[in-house]
Every structure is written in C-alpha cells, then in structure tokens.
From Swiss-Prot:
It is found in: Cytoplasm, Nucleoid. This is Maintenance of carboxysome distribution protein A. It catalyses: ATP + H2O = ADP + phosphate + H(+). SUPFAM superfamilies: P-loop containing nucleoside triphosphate hydrolases (SSF52540). GO terms for cellular component: cytoplasm; nucleoid. ATP binds at G16, G17, G19, K20, T21, T22, Q45. Keywords: ATP-binding, Carbon dioxide fixation, Cytoplasm, Hydrolase, Magnesium, Metal-binding, Nucleotide-binding. Disruption phenotype: Carboxysomes (Cb) are no longer evenly distributed over the nucleoid region on the whole cell length; 76% localize to one cell pole, 7% have Cb at both poles while 17% lack Cbs. Cbs are nucleoid excluded. The gene is mcdA.
Length: 216
C-alpha cells in the first residue's frame, strides 16, 4: 500500500481508446519539472516504452525512468517507488483486471480519463467499482475523473460535466482539450512540453491537472 514512498499516480480506465497513454506520457513529462519520475508501463501494448526509448534520444529531453524489467507490473512499481518522488502507472485495459486492482492498491491517486460521450461514461463505471474494491485494502486511495478530448463549446461536453458528477467520483476542473498538438507530440516521439510555443497551451493544461492532483 502507498505510504511515505513516491507519490504514485495511476492512469486507469478499463475501457480502451480513452487517451490513457497520451495522458500518462504528458503527465509524467510534466512531473519531471517537479522531481524524479519513475514510469511503469502495465499496458501490454508497451506504448510507453517506445515513447521513452524515442524521447531518450532527444538531447534536451527530461525522460522518466521506465521500469519494465519484470513481467509483473506490480513488482516493477514496487521497485520504482523507493527511488523517485513520483511514479506514474499506465494501467492495462480490461484484459488484466486483476493486475489493475493490485496496482490500484499500491497507488495514492487514480486518474480516470473519460471521453465526452455517454457510452464512454457508462463504460467507466466498472473502473470506479474496481477503485472501491481497492479501497478496502488502501482506504486512503483517492480518485478523480478527467474529461479528455473536450470541445468547450460543445453541448455534449457541457451535458457530460453535469452527468459525470452523479457517479460519485470527483471531476477535475481542468479537462484535456481536443488539440492536434497531442497527436503531433506522439508522432514526434516527445511530450507537449518539448514542443515550445506549439505545445504551450497543452502543457499549461497538463500542469493545471497536476496542480489539482498532486498534494501541495
């Protein structure tokens, strides 16, 4: 269970396609400005490993340390925690529900990305139920939903912000806007923090999310 080790943040949603890995990469990049960051890629697709490998080739890049020596992501997490100020975990999809629950027990905070559509919202209820299960072992575990790929002027986005509050899990004030720069960063193998003026608005957005999540 998380205690006085690194602040451990997991990005989790049992539904795929919610932007989980994109948020994980940019959050971990933002945290490198605040301390030592470890990264655990628990998603079998291994997208974070490719990102770290690519990013480490950039001369000015501050790249989190990836823990992937063990096939068991929980073991990788326990190895990372004593050596860093922050650890970010990209959780697996619904194929590995047992592993996700074990990871949650070791975390301080679960961030749940949700796309602004009713189907995605309903699919997230299973993740929320898993968090409640993890809290039986780790009662201090906190969680919040973050709307991803939002369009502020969209009626759907406004309706979702109202509906999502009924799930009983806090919703971050900051949402992740639908921005081409997030896709561009992936293509270039970097984070939005490395894109200069092009990525400034997105980087500010990620920092605002971190300000809401990380204890002051």
């Amino acid at each position: 269970m998380a205690s006085n080790k690194a602040f451990t943040l997991a990005v989790a949603n049992l539904k795929g396609g919610c932007g989980k890995t994109t948020i994980s990469t940019n959050i971990s990049a933002g945290l490198t400005q605040r301390g030592r960051v470890g990264l655990v890629d628990a998603d079998p697709q291994g997208a974070l490993k490719h990102w770290v490998d690519w990013g480490s080739k950039e001369a000015d890049a501050q790249v989190p340390v990836l823990y992937s020596d063990h096939t068991d992501p929980v073991q990788n997490l326990k190895l990372a925690q004593p050596n860093h100020d922050f650890v970010v975990v990209d959780c697996p999809p619904s194929l590995d529900m047992a592993i996700t629950c074990q990871l949650m027990i070791e975390c301080d905070f679960i961030l749940i990305p949700v796309l602004p559509s009713p189907l995605d919202l309903w699919a997230s209820t299973q993740t929320i139920e898993m968090i409640e299960s993890a809290r039986k072992t780790n009662p201090k575990l906190k969680a919040a939903l973050v709307l991803n790929q939002t369009e502020p002027r969209s009626a759907m986005t406004r309706a979702m912000q109202t509906t999502i509050e009924r799930l009983g899990v806090p919703v971050l004030t900051t949402s992740v806007r639908r921005r081409a720069v997030y896709r561009n960063a992936v293509v270039e193998g970097v984070s939005v923090f490395q894109l200069g003026a092009r990525g400034r608005s997105a980087a500010d957005e990620i920092n605002q999310i971190l300000n809401e999540v990380i204890p002051s």
